Amino acid sequence: HYSNCSRYKQVIDGLWNSKILANKIEDVPFIPVSLFKSHELSSVNKEDIRSTMTSSGTTGQTVSKIYIDTQTSQDQQKGLANSLQHILGRKRLPMLILDTDASFKNPEYMNARGAGVLGMMRYGRSHCFALNKDLEPDLEAIKDFLKINGSAPFFIFGFTFLVWTKFHEILKNNNLDLSNGILIHSGGWKKMIEN
């Protein structure tokens, strides 16, 4: 980044007054995450950008932007697959998604959450969305999923705020056996702070 992003180089030189040699991840200098909102920090040539990841903008109107090239995208997918394999095993498990399919089917709703759901779906099979388009629990769909898949390991994925604000409530009020479920939750914690 230091060699390929002039703004990043300016920040590092301004904070540390010298070029830092980072031989391991622990040596990479920390920078305020807010810089990704206020500055275009990209070490990828514009023509090589495959996608741009954006934050949710929960703490303000301005979103952080991270520019991804093809190699980085492939590395991310391999890294995630390797990490999940240690948790979920080698076979794709039936997947209960604690979200609505509207989070990615409708371009109007497509955001970081929708992209996150789509990205995680490749690691599961026999997908079941636990929430309807109004983000209310679909108890019948959940019960049907558990009837078919609940006796063996299955994968549960959702964003933290939906796990606690929507799914946790339905668990308290219904006799659902999720003992074979493997829950992975991600992001959405800022929305919980608001509550």
Task: Describe the residue ranges of each PLM region.
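Conserved ATP-dependent adenylate/AMP-binding module captured primarily in the ANL superfamily
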Residues: Q77-L93, E140-I148
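Active-site diphosphate/adenylate-binding microenvironment
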Residues: S3, R7-Q10, G14-T54, T62-I66, ...
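A short, flexible beta-alpha/helix-coil linker loop
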Residues: Q61-T62, A102, G188-M192
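Active-site glycine/GP-rich loop and adjacent strand/helix microenvironment
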Residues: E108-Y109, L118-N195
